[in-house]
Amino acid sequence: MKEEDSSFKLCVPGIVALQSPPNKAFRSTDTVGFLESELKKLLGMQQESRLWKLGSQEGRELLTRPEITVVEGEGYEVQRRLRHLPSPISVAQCLLLEEKGEMGNWPPE
């Protein structure tokens, strides 16, 4: 089975419009933790951050398990429902990386 690279649209709070938004390719076997780490480097973020997936059926889903891989495939949805795992990230979705403010607060939802 061949690993495919995927790139995701990145949403950055506080930046209205980027002429060419940051784009980074990831493998389906990369973990959410690796994705967050690479995006922080790409954006030069120093503070604590959290990663959201936008555009899912739930609307906005916080990705809290850094060990989960970026997976798409048959059977994953069934496992997700049984084990309450986050749904897989698809290319059509947007990732939102939030950084904790200087006062230690998260941006308002």
Curated annotation (Swiss-Prot):
Pfam families: Ubiquitin_3. The keyword Cytoplasm applies. It is found in: Cytoplasm; Membrane; Golgi apparatus. It is a peripheral membrane protein. GO terms for biological process: cell differentiation; spermatogenesis. Keywords: Cytoplasm, Developmental protein, Differentiation, Golgi apparatus, Membrane, Spermatogenesis. GO terms for cellular component: Golgi apparatus; membrane. This is Putative gametogenetin-binding protein 1. It comes from Homo sapiens (Human).
